[in-house]
Regions:
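Active-site beta->alpha loop and helix N-cap motifs at the rims of alpha/beta catalytic domains
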Residues: 1-106
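Short glycine/proline-rich, acidic loop/turn segments that cap or connect secondary-structure elements
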Residues: 234-241
Length: 241
C-alpha cells in the first residue's frame, strides 16, 4: 500500500515502474496493472500517460482534488482522463479525503464508454447503493465490474446480491472482487476466502459460518486500520502487520 504523498517526493513514476517490473518478474501469467491517478485534470492526464508508458492497462481515478466541483465539472474531468486510459472509478470515503458523490454522478460516470470498473469504498451502505443504482441506471452493469473497497464490510459485500430498479425492471448485480488495503496483509488467506465466497455464491447456498466471517474480518480490520483514531494510522497499520 502506497500513499498519495509519493508524488511530493518524486516517487510516482519510480513506484509504478518497480511495481510493473516486479509483477512481470514474479507472475507466470499476465497480470492486470492498474495505476492510481490523482490531482486535477492536467495532473491526472499526465499521470495516465506515465502509467501507459510503464505498461499499465488502466487507471484508478481519485477525485479528492476536485472537492467543491459540480457534477458537470467532475464528469468533464473524468471524460478527459478516460480519453487517455481505461478508467476504474474510486469512491473514497470522506473520512480520509474523499468527496460525497450522488447516484446521478455514478450514472453519468458509468455512461463513459472507457470506464471498466469501480472501486466502491465510501464505508457507507447508502453511498454503496448509490454506485450500484447509478451503474444500473446507465445500463452498464454488464460492462463495468464492481469491486468493494469497504474494508468494514468485505465478506457481505462479496456475498450479497444487489437488487435495484431500472424503470419497472429489477436488476440484480454483484460485487465481484475487492481492491482493499485489508488484503495487503495475509494475502493468501484473502485469496482463499474470496474463492470460498465465490464457490458459495455459485452453489446458491451460503453457510452461516461464512456469514459470521464478516463480523470477524471487520473486527480484525478495526485493529490495523486504526478505527479508534478515525483511520489516522490505517496505512502504517497495514505496513506494520
Amino acid at each position: 500500500s502506497t500513499q498519495f504523498a509519493i508524488r511530493d517526493a518524486g516517487l510516482y513514476e519510480p513506484v509504478l515502474e518497480l511495481a510493473a517490473r516486479t509483477a512481470r518478474e514474479w507472475s507466470k501469467t499476465p497480470v492486470l496493472l492498474i495505476a492510481g491517478l490523482a490531482g486535477r485534470t492536467e495532473q491526472a492526464c499526465q499521470e495516465a500517460q506515465i502509467a501507459l508508458a510503464q505498461g499499465y492497462h488502466a487507471g484508478m481515478l481519485s477525485l479528492a482534488a476536485m472537492k467543491g466541483a459540480t457534477v458537470d465539472a467532475l464528469i468533464e474531468h473524468c471524460e478527459a482522463v478516460a480519453a487517455s486510459i481505461p478508467l476504474v472509478g474510486f469512491y473514497l470515503q470522506p473520512a480520509v479525503g474523499g468527496i460525497a458523490l450522488p447516484a446521478e454522478f455514478w450514472r453519468r460516470f458509468a455512461a463513459i464508454e472507457n470506464v471498466i470498473a469501480i472501486k466502491i469504498a465510501p464505508f457507507d451502505r447508502y453511498r454503496t447503493l448509490d454506485v450500484v443504482r447509478g451503474v444500473v441506471a446507465a445500463g452498464a452493469q454488464d460492462r463495468i465490474t464492481l469491486y468493494t473497497g469497504n474494508d468494514d464490510h468485505i465478506v457481505l459485500d462479496l456475498l450479497a446480491p444487489y437488487a435495484v430498479k431500472r424503470g419497472e425492471a429489477q436488476v440484480t448485480v454483484r460485487i465481484r472482487g475487492g481492491l482493499l488495503g485489508h488484503w495487503s496483509v495475509w494475502t493468501r488467506s484473502a485469496v482463499e476466502q474470496l474463492q470460498r465466497i465465490h464457490a458459495a455464491v455459485e452453489s446458491g447456498s451460503v453457510p452461516a459460518s461464512l456469514l459470521a466471517l464478516d463480523s470477524r474480518v471487520t473486527d480484525c480490520n478495526s485493529a490495523f486500520f486504526d478505527v479508534a483514531n478515525g483511520f489516522a494510522g490505517c496505512i502504517p497499520g497495514c505496513h506494520e502487520v
